[in-house]
Amino acid sequence: MLELDRINTFRGPAHVLNGVSLTVRDAESVVLVGRNGAGKTTTIDSIMGLLPVRSGTITFNGTDISRLPTHQRALAGIGYAPEDAGIFPDLTVVENFLISQSLARAAGKAAPTAGDSGIDERVLTLFPEVRAFTKRRGLFLSGGQKKMVAIARAMTLSPTILLLDEPFEGLAPVVVTRFIEAVTRIKAMGVSLLIAESNLMTASRVADRLYAIDRGEIIFEGEPRRAFENEEVMKTIRG
């Protein structure tokens, strides 16, 4: 289980997160919804250690990870796919995967079963489409293709929780549905998910529970359908 207890995070002089608390239980899909600038990405970055928390605690499976470096959080079982996908542009898709697969081996994780593509077959089941462009450099991938690679690559380390920052942003509706299918499959593997999302309707399609954030503070927690009945949430999301 992942638990944030009253964390405060700054970006430079700006106080972005103000006492944020949330939990993600085992094999649960939780969505953090809010408009741009509300604090979603900062929350994800705080969990991954990309931004230091000024106060409060982040606990993962009973251990305080608030001061751990990013790579140790990843090795502890926290997977991460950033909003910009984080694909190395000058490397092929296979080479992008090989970096993660080598980290998995170095960490003593179960060795991925690489097929003819050279990529872990387990994660390719999430997005079989990736097989068609494994030799293409990251620079020449579409936005949707980059996101596919980022999510599948994050699964290489066999995380117990996966953090996804705006995975559906900029995708056509039919592609969003395809990504939601992949997220559902990840959850069926027993992996917990924390997803940052700005669209409440999309959030409701993947969330077991939903948190709404505005100006760095949690303003709602509950079932997705309840969010649509909450006047403050609806006003905030619509801007």
Spans of features found by a protein language model:
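The feature captures the beta-strand-to-loop junction immediately N-terminal to the Walker
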Residues: V33-R35
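Conserved ABC ATPase signature
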Residues: R137-L141
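Catalytic Walker B motif of ABC-type/P-loop ATPase nucleotide-binding domains
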Residues: L162-E166
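Conserved ABC transporter NBD signature motif
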Residues: G56-T63, A76, A110, G115-G118, ...
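ABC ATPase C-loop
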Residues: A154-M155
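Helix-to-loop junction immediately C-terminal to a conserved catalytic motif
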Residues: M48
